[in-house]
């Protein structure tokens, strides 16, 4: 999973509402291996991370949805996919020169919110792994829903003399 996966799914500026884990019991101070982590967005879209013992094969789809599957090398099962892609509008141009964005005050392509949402995704998985259970998340408040133990992992006390 990476930034482009969320970009392709149109999920750059939001977070999943649920994270499910299939993993052995974790050490309380570290996250180890997992078999599967499933992130689900409010529209039902999922990102699945396969872990320990999973080996990607040629028949493993990179993206899978109700209309078909896309594999490595853009091989896919979606009928007439190239014609359908040609009908789509070009994406908005992105500002990829960071220094130019600083000078002109324009938004950088991979800005702080996208970076924050990337970190949130990873940290949601880490929290679910440490607690070894499904967690529900509110992408607006950016807190786990009805779960004090999970929320304590979001904002852990810092060791002295460190503070924010």
Predicted features along the sequence, with ranges:
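Glycine-enriched catalytic-core subsegment of oxygenase/oxidase enzymes
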Residues: 8-9, 13-164
